[in-house]
């Protein structure tokens, strides 16, 4: 069975995210290591890093960070590109201090420059981040998108081409978001649509490149090019889509993280985790 968990808040200190994932019975954690709405957020204190390490050792599961949504790694503007690179370097530094396994990053938007140009810019900027960090760094996972606007990643080949264009391809992988794939036109709720998605992964970045799943149902229709998450089984993907994924032997031990609404605190996370585990036994 896959490892199930959720994105948890780090409010009050990053170690609180570990505390809360244990409380809800999660086996894998995703978090923001700092305020993702700020370009230069405050780094975790030394005491919080130590507390995170203690709780992480007791938790024992994989930990992922989601990079700030402010970062457009495909930006070609000099100042904006430098700002994106700097923000990702700082993210890597925080993750290295915390012992985070991998960083999830949206592949960015080309802003009208064209898909090919955006892909090359993303690869160049990613290479600069790895060059500046050197040594031991977390793995960087490029997340697929719903393909909204000029965003890269709606086509899974975008992720493959960024990886192929990077000098640090061995340190790159893929995070597959079910709601994003659905929004981009992959009908994961049908046998044919699921098969097409898996074939595009296999012929693009490769199945081995997929290190993490974001398991989210979708409020919007397939192919809408929109990104609206909802609870498992309550959206247009429906339970059938998740039965296919959760019981696919290729991903039998993969980490899978919820990014579903938290309007009632941790209760929704508990319900969604219970649903995933039930469907994984279907």
From Swiss-Prot:
Binding site for Zn(2+) 2: 143, 177, 214, 259
Residues the entry annotates as binding Zn(2+) 3: 180, 227, 229
Cofactors, names only: Zn(2+)
Pfam families: AP_endonuc_2
Highest taxon of the lineage: Bacteria
UniProt keyword annotation of Nuclease present: yes
Keywords carried by this UniProt record: DNA damage, DNA repair, Endonuclease, Hydrolase, Metal-binding, Nuclease, Zinc
Plastid in keyword set: no
SUPFAM superfamilies according to UniProt: Xylose isomerase-like
Catalytic reaction equation(s): Endonucleolytic cleavage to 5'-phosphooligonucleotide end-products
Cofactor note (record): Binds 3 Zn(2+) ions.
GO terms for biological process, alphabetical: base-excision repair
Chain residues that bind Zn(2+) 1: 66, 106, 143
GO molecular function per UniProt: deoxyribonuclease IV (phage-T4-induced) activity; DNA binding; DNA-(apurinic or apyrimidinic site) endonuclease activity; phosphoric diester hydrolase activity; zinc ion binding
EC annotation from Swiss-Prot or TrEMBL: 3.1.21.2
NCBIfam families named in the record: nfo
Protein purpose: Endonuclease IV plays a role in DNA repair. It cleaves phosphodiester bonds at apurinic or apyrimidinic (AP) sites, generating a 3'-hydroxyl group and a 5'-terminal sugar phosphate.
Family affiliation: Belongs to the AP endonuclease 2 family.
UniProt xrefs under HAMAP family: Nfo
This protein's name: Probable endonuclease 4
Upper taxonomic lineage: Bacteria, Pseudomonadati, Thermodesulfobacteriota, Desulfovibrionia, Desulfovibrionales
Designated gene of the protein: nfo
């Amino acid at each position: 069975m896959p490892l199930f968990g959720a994105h948890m808040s780090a409010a009050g200190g990053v170690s609180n995210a570990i505390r809360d994932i244990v409380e809800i019975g999660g086996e894998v954690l995703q978090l923001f290591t700092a305020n993702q709405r700020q370009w230069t957020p405050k780094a975790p204190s030394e005491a919080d890093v130590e507390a995170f390490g203690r709780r992480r050792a007791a938790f024992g599961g994989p930990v992922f960070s989601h990079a700030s949504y402010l970062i457009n790694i495909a930006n070609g503007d000099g100042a904006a590109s430098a700002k994106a690179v700097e923000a990702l370097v700082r993210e890597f530094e925080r993750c290295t201090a915390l012992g985070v396994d991998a960083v999830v990053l949206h592949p960015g938007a080309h802003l009208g420059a064209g898909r090919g140009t955006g892909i090359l810019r993303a690869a160049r900027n990613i290479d600069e981040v790895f060059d500046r960090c050197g040594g031991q760094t977390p793995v960087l996972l490029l997340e697929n998108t719903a393909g909204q606007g000029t965003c890269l990643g709606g086509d899974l080949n975008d992720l493959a081409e960024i990886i192929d264009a990077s000098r640090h391809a061995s340190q790159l992988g893929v995070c597959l978001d079910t709601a994003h794939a659905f929004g981009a036109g992959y009908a994961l709720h049908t046998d044919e649509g699921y098969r097409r998605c898996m074939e595009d992964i296999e012929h693009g970045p490769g199945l081995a490149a997929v290190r993490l799943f974001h398991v989210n149902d979708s409020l919007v229709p397939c192919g809408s090019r929109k990104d609206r998450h909802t609870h498992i089984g309550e959206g247009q993907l429906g339970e059938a889509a998740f039965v296919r994924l959760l019981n696919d032997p290729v991903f039998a031990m993969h980490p899978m993280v919820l990014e579903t609404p938290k309007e009632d605190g941790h209760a929704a996370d508990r319900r969604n985790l219970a649903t995933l585990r039930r469907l994984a036994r279907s």
